[in-house]
Amino acid sequence: MPKGYWVTFYRSVSNPAALTAYGKVAGPAIAAGGGRILARGAPARAYEAGLDQRCVVIEFDSLERAFAAYESPEYQAAKKLLEGSVERDVRMVEGI
């Protein structure tokens, strides 16, 4: 079964303290859902469109596990901590 990947790009962060608080709650919620953070932070180098956006890549044993972790009550509680503080794009993709 192919792995699932949760990829988030942060277009803007207006409240870094909210992002820190989110991380403290989201990390355990994601881990409880089977997620493993593979990469997190600003790009070392940006190509093509050249957007310098914070990025997070999380691996799951399957795409279904990624969906379930995102939709879990624990993660949804963490997500509320970001309201009004970030603009981001969250995508789920299946590995090959």
Predicted feature locations:
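Short S/T/G/P-rich N-terminal loop/turn motif that feeds into the first structured element of a domain
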Residues: M1-R54, D61-E71, E94-I96
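C-terminal structural segments of small proteins and small subunits
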Residues: L63-R91
